[in-house]
Regions:
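Right-handed parallel beta-helix/beta-spiral solenoid domain characteristic of secreted/periplasmic
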Residues: 4-11, 25-30, 34-36, 43-116, ...
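Solenoidal tandem-repeat scaffolds enriched in leucines and small polar residues
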Residues: 147-269, 274, 280
Length: 534
């Protein structure tokens, strides 16, 4: 459907947006839009959304991090002084573009520069599309809050949180359809190379550190997409997040009576996460029915943080990753990490499948804690670091004996520094994985981790392990997959892999492994219309 387009400049946009109705298409003309734009209680329709666009419009003050650094640190210190974790999270609603109580709105092809702390903020909104945005700097690229916030589509957006390196060159190359081996050899950002992790996210309880107003970098402690207790139905696809602290981060801290109605139905697919200083994917507290597929991760301290109290029905497959670069200055103690971060205790409402992914790592898969109903099968893993102690799949201390009898108190004390060995009790399965490590599978099995019989300790024979080329992780050797059937939240089952048809790893011939779309994405309201509007 083609919509008539009205043009407006920085001097009149604030009055004009108040009168938008279904079917309006407002084009922001070339210029700098420094004052916040607020869309409040506006409703488009499924077949005629309100569209806000403008290829040459720049929203934000263009404030550089260095100019905001002390302010951000002081605001974090104020939070710390009140007994809270030091951060700018409580100020995320201070955004350049705010949508409040809105439905059926598309924001596309806008640029944001120097929006501290937030570029786009959604509050109690439904059916919002954010497409083709370019966001430079900021603590939060996109923030979302409200238990009625749902059906949010974020696609084809680029965010470089710290542009002091060549992050935008990486984005430009990828958008041009190029590989990025050359760009990855270019200068990384100060956030990746020079800033200590604790200067961004350290606190007194965990790290013995108070906020240093002059030297810290608390304004970087944010995310590409941060959700505070929203209903869900979120799709984040085909975005590029480079030189940032975090990628996608959900909280679910609502009252117990409505916990189950938040952080549900999330699809994260086809994104690039490049030089992420903390986590790429991080659902916290409670979450259900997440699909994470076909993403590319290039250097991330800790890609998957799954520190949830209760969750279920996670499907993580077809992703490729290289963790080969060491972040931070020499004194930084947060440089190696692990691939999965687990909680102290966890209850599973359903399975969590991690299958047919391809990784090149310099750290363990998981070093400590526990997780319930975790199924890790058919993954292909090689290493960029030759030291077997620091890359041992379950941590260098995996041979330590678990306490006799494994009573809960003793178990949790042991697991504070070790990956759990209570696999049968927790429903943990590792099978069909090809992991190129000298301790795998024999030494790992002997240490009390009951790996499946199809686990192999050989090279997956990736054709090219150089970072940045996803097809380089196609294997030269065929290793048959083990059969895997997925349980869906509604009780249905779907075949994911069959030994006679599939191989280990993300690549199945010339394509990444495919499984049926989540039902909520198949029947996404306005899905076809959204494509026609662009």
């Amino acid at each position: 459907m083609t919509q008539a387009c009205e043009e407006v400049g920085p001097d009149k946009v604030h009055k004009r947006v108040r009168r938008l109705i279904a079917g309006d298409r407002l084009h922001l003309t070339k210029g700098d839009y420094k004052k916040p734009i607020v869309l409040s209680s506006l409703s488009g329709a499924e077949d005629s959304p309100i569209v806000l666009t403008g290829t040459d419009a720049v929203l934000g003050t263009k404030l550089k991090f260095k100019k905001y650094q002390a302010t951000g640190n002081a605001l974090a210190a104020a939070q710390e002084a009140g007994g809270e974790f030091p951060g700018l999270y409580y100020l995320a609603d201070n955004a350049v573009l705010v949508l409040r109580n809105c439905q059926w709105i598309t924001i596309e092809k806008l640029s944001f520069d120097g929006c501290w702390p937030t570029a786009v903020y959604l509050e109690n909104c439904q059916h919002i599309t954010l497409r083709g945005l370019k966001i430079n700097g900021g603590t939060f690229a996109i923030g979302a809050t409200g238990v009625t916030t749902r059906h949010i589509l974020v696609e084809d957006c680029d965010w470089v949180q710290d542009p002091s390196g060549n992050g935008w060159e990486l984005c430009d190359a990828l958008r041009a359809g190029k590989t990025i081996e050359k760009e990855l050899d270019g200068p990384p950002s100060k956030l990746w190379r020079d800033i200590d992790w604790v200067e961004v996210h350290g606190d007194w309880l965990e790290n013995g550190k108070r906020v240093d107003i002059e030297h810290d970098a608390r304004a970087y402690d944010g995310d590409f997409f941060r959700a505070w207790s929203i209903a869900g139905y979120v799709v984040i696809r085909n975005n590029i997040i480079a030189d940032a602290f975090n990628g996608v981060h959900f909280f679910n801290q609502v009252a117990e009576s409505i916990i189950d109605s938040c952080s549900r139905n999330v699809l994260i697919e086809g994104n690039w996460f490049i030089r992420i200083r903390d986590n790429a994917i991080e659902p916290e507290h409670y979450a259900w029915n997440w699909t994470v597929r076909h993403n590319v991760i290039v250097d991330c301290y800790l890609p998957f943080s799954l520190q949830m109290a209760r969750s279920g029905y996670f499907y993580i497959y077809g992703n490729v990753a290289w963790n080969v670069g060491k972040p931070g200055p020499d004194k930084d103690e947060h440089t190696r990490g692990q691939f999965f971060k687990f909680p102290t205790d966890h209850y599973a409402d359903g399975p969590h499948y991690v299958f047919n992914n391809s990784w090149v790592l310099r750290a363990p898969l998981v070093k400590k804690m526990r997780f319930s109903n975790f199924v890790h099968v058919n993954n292909a893993i090689d290493y960029s670091d030759s030291d077997p102690d620091v890359t041992a799949p379950f941590g260098g201390n995996f041979r330590d004996a678990a306490p006799a009898g494994y009573q809960m108190e003793a178990a949790l004390l042991f697991e504070a520094k070790h990956f759990t060995k209570a696999w049968q009790y927790l429903g943990i399965q590792f099978d069909g994985d090809v992991i190129h490590h000298p301790t795998f599978p024999n030494d790992v099995n002997a240490a009390g981790f009951p790996l499946g019989a199809a686990s192999l300790g050989v090279s997956p024979a990736f054709s090219d392990m150089a970072p940045g080329r996803p097809d380089g992780l196609k294997p030269l050797t065929h290793h048959p997959a083990v059969d895997l059937t997925l349980l869906l939240p509604n009780g249905d089952k779907v075949t994911a892999t069959q030994a006679q048809q599939n191989q280990v790893g993300a690549w199945q011939g010339s394509d990444l492994i495919k499984v049926e779309d989540p039902i909520f994405w198949t029947y996404w309201p306005g899905k076809q219309d959204a494509r026609e509007v662009t």
